[in-house]
Amino acid sequence: MTAHLRPVLAGLPVYVPGKTVPGAIKLASNETVFGPLPSVRAAIEHATQSINRYPDNGCLAVKAALARHVSSLSAADFGPEHIAVGCGSVSLCQQLVQITASVGDEVIFGWRSFELYPPQVQVAGATAIQVPLTNHTFDLEAMLAAVTERTRLIIVCDPNNPTSTVVQPEALAEFVRSVPPHILVAIDEAYVEYLRDGTVPDSPHLVRTHSNVVVLRTFSKAYGLAGLRVGYAVGQPDVIAPLDKVYVPFTVSSLAQAAAIASVQAADELLARTDAVVAERGRVSAELRAAGFTVPPSQANFVWLPLEDRTTDFVTQAAKAHIVVRPYGADGVRVTIAAPEENDALLRFARCWITHRDGAR
């Protein structure tokens, strides 16, 4: 006899990560091309001496380091009680859904956005309210209009994954002011370190001035710790404490905690690396536009190509050229900004592909 499982799981999509193909250029997972700093590597190596022991379940040293770091980014002071640590920001997002939404409740986010939002809401038994983007960007006015008495959580992915766009800081602040205070607003800032051109929101200030705001960040992208899985949330203690209650014990390993602390201590050196990525982002975007592609203005470490019905062909032909990119149904393709020589290979392929496509019409 087959075990009785939750019916909701039958229609739940399985998360498909970016492909890794031996010998191919991988531009599918928004990973940094930079390896760990020597100081971070040394911290990880030192932590291996005690991996026979469980990690600190409270991540106390990590929280203290992050509280100091976040305080340095804002005029406000933060303590460890304002910080939750999790197995990547994606796990913290799932925890946020767990503490806010259940059967009959609604969670609002723009779409298309991070593809794990819908299944996380579905698993909780809640309803995902997907508000269409406008010009590849979150439509904050439409999201406000979607609020009902059943709304429990609103997620703003900023910069948005996969479209790479950002909402203006003033618009985000006004949006937060307009959301009813009993509804939690989560600002997912996985790519915040790549923001430039005056687009960096003062999200720590929003946390301190609005009790219903929580910010999610990760060490997987700019800090280069994707393989260790550690992220954090910044919020008011009455939000952080419930997050810790639904944290799966010991999921942030000793190695991840040591690497996170060392990375925060070397934040200036690590974040200086993002300048090279931003420069390449500008070059790749400009050359793709010159070749005839539509490329929304990116504020992340990737670009978005809204190819619609041409998506499958682009992805298939790119794979034949030993380049792996990330397709999103019939919407488009996300392409990671990588090392200059890898970006050059992508540009050569893209020019060839669009010339062939245009010539075939």
Curated annotation (Swiss-Prot):
Superkingdom of this protein's organism: Bacteria
Entry's EC annotation: 2.6.1.57
Cofactor: pyridoxal 5'-phosphate
Keyword presence, Transferase: yes
Single annotated GO MF: aromatic-amino-acid transaminase activity
Gene Ontology biological process: L-histidine biosynthetic process
Modified residues (N6-(pyridoxal phosphate)lysine): 221
Keywords for this protein: Aminotransferase, Pyridoxal phosphate, Transferase
CDD domains from the UniProt entry: AAT_like
One Pfam family of this chain: Aminotran_1_2
Catalyzed reactions: an aromatic L-alpha-amino acid + 2-oxoglutarate = an aromatic oxo-acid + L-glutamate
Quaternary structure and interacting proteins, as annotated: Homodimer.
Family as reported in the entry's similarity comment: Belongs to the class-II pyridoxal-phosphate-dependent aminotransferase family.
NCBIfam families hit by this protein: PRK03321.1
Described purpose of this protein according to its UniProt entry: Aminotransferase that catalyzes the conversion of aromatic amino acids and 2-oxoglutarate into corresponding aromatic oxo acids and L-glutamate.
Protein name: Aromatic amino acid aminotransferase
Native organism taxonomy: Bacteria, Bacillati, Actinomycetota, Actinomycetes, Mycobacteriales
